[in-house]
Amino acid sequence: MRVTQGTFSFLPDLTNDQIRKQIQYAINKGWALSVEYTDDPHPRNSYWEMWGLPLFDVKDPAAIMFEVEACRKEKSNYYIKLLAFDSTKGVESTAMSFMVNRPAHEPGFVLRRIESNDRVQRYQIHSYATEKPEGERY
């Protein structure tokens, strides 16, 4: 099952050239970029690990691609995304985020039905990947 999170998530994976163009777009807008990774693909997992520090004031797409490639090399079986932050209003908020790497095999999710009081049905999404310890999921 293909995880769909962020901009361009329903499109085929971006090529390095397309990623560079998106980086240039973010730089032209004055956004700061950062690289994050995780092995827990749950849709509500918004706390991914940061790869280094955010790349404030970096104006060269090659420098950001260098960080993306370094993260891909070390975390090749992880989900990796590139985030662009817009701080024009004084409060940083994500303006764009998209995946730049994903594991070779994505096991998907199970939907569990849970009975609550008064026969109320509740549902829970659980990633098959999280059944293994962190760092050994893919």
Swiss-Prot record:
Q: What name is this protein filed under?
A: Ribulose bisphosphate carboxylase small subunit
- Plastid listed as a keyword: yes
Localization recorded for this chain is:
Plastid, Chloroplast
Name the Gene3D superfamilies on file.
Ribulose bisphosphate carboxylase, small subunit
Cite the PANTHER family for this sequence.
RIBULOSE BISPHOSPHATE CARBOXYLASE SMALL CHAIN 1, CHLOROPLASTIC (PTHR31262), RIBULOSE BISPHOSPHATE CARBOXYLASE SMALL SUBUNIT (PTHR31262:SF23)
Say if the entry is tagged with keyword RNA-binding: no
- Taxonomically, the superkingdom here is Eukaryota
The protein's matches in Pfam families, at most eight in alphabetical order, are given as: RuBisCO_small
Output the HAMAP family linked to this UniProt entry: RuBisCO_S_bact (MF_00859)
- Extract one GO molecular function annotation from the record: ribulose-bisphosphate carboxylase activity
Supply the alphabetized keyword list. Answer: Calvin cycle, Carbon dioxide fixation, Chloroplast, Photorespiration, Photosynthesis, Plastid
Annotated gene: rbcS
Primary role: RuBisCO catalyzes two reactions: the carboxylation of D-ribulose 1,5-bisphosphate, the primary event in carbon dioxide fixation, as well as the oxidative fragmentation of the pentose substrate in the photorespiration process. Both reactions occur simultaneously and in competition at the same active site. Although the small subunit is not catalytic it is essential for maximal activity.
Primary site of residence? plastid
- Record-linked InterPro entries: RuBisCO_ssu, RuBisCO_ssu_dom, RuBisCO_ssu_sf
Further information in the entry reads: In this alga, in contrast to plants, the small subunit is encoded in the chloroplast.
The UniProt entry's GO biological process terms, in alphabetical order, are: reductive pentose-phosphate cycle
Q: What is the lineage of its organism?
A: Eukaryota, Rhodophyta, Bangiophyceae, Cyanidiales, Cyanidiaceae
Report the sequence similarity comment from the record.
Belongs to the RuBisCO small chain family.
Summarize the subunit comment: Heterohexadecamer of 8 large and 8 small subunits.
